[in-house]
Amino acid sequence: DLDKAKIGYLPASTFKIANTMIGLETGKIVDENMVFKWDGVKKAVPIWEKDLVLKDAFQFSCVPCYRELARNIGFQDMNAYLAKLKFGNMQIKEHSVDMFWLAGESTITSFQQIDFLQRFYEKKLPISDRTHQIVKKILLLEEKESYKMSGKTGWAIQDEADNGWFVGYLETGENVYY
């Protein structure tokens, strides 16, 4: 639906892609072996109730892990990197640094998601090669002889409507589909 693809929605957990990049670039994520420590408090999703390495926190879409990461990055660095990455239209305030992708006025369209992933894939984002390689690894969902599928899900309720995302790319030989 091309009309719907032009409408902005909350990015929800698809923002974990950019959040991971920013965490790596600022040094708040040391490397792909970094562990998000569970605080012992019961979570909305039982799989989040343990220490998680970066890839698991990303793939299990651990909201508490990524909210903590955003707080550690801080408002100034988050705002600066969002401007550099050009990830949709994020509306970030100091008090919402750990929630702006889940609730509020931040939006991204399907076309903007594709543009962001294409710039990532083509190494046109202002991130280091190291960050690119780590994010590429954690995005990988499935690899077969004939293809590689990479992506991220997201889900948010906005204006009393559910919005689900799957953003990613499929590599088949020399072709890439977003």
Report the location of each language-model feature.
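Acidic helix-start/capping segments at beta-turn-to-alpha-helix junctions
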Residues: M34-K50, D56-Q59, I73-G74, M99, ...
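Mid-domain, small-residue-enriched loop/turn segments at the edges of structured enzyme/sensor domains
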Residues: P46, V53-L54, Y66-Q118, E122
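A conserved catalytic-loop motif detector
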Residues: A103-G151
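Active-site-proximal alpha-helical segments within enzyme catalytic domains
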Residues: I17, A57, G104-K123, G164-Y178
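Short, well-structured active-site flanking segments
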Residues: L24-G40, I127-H132
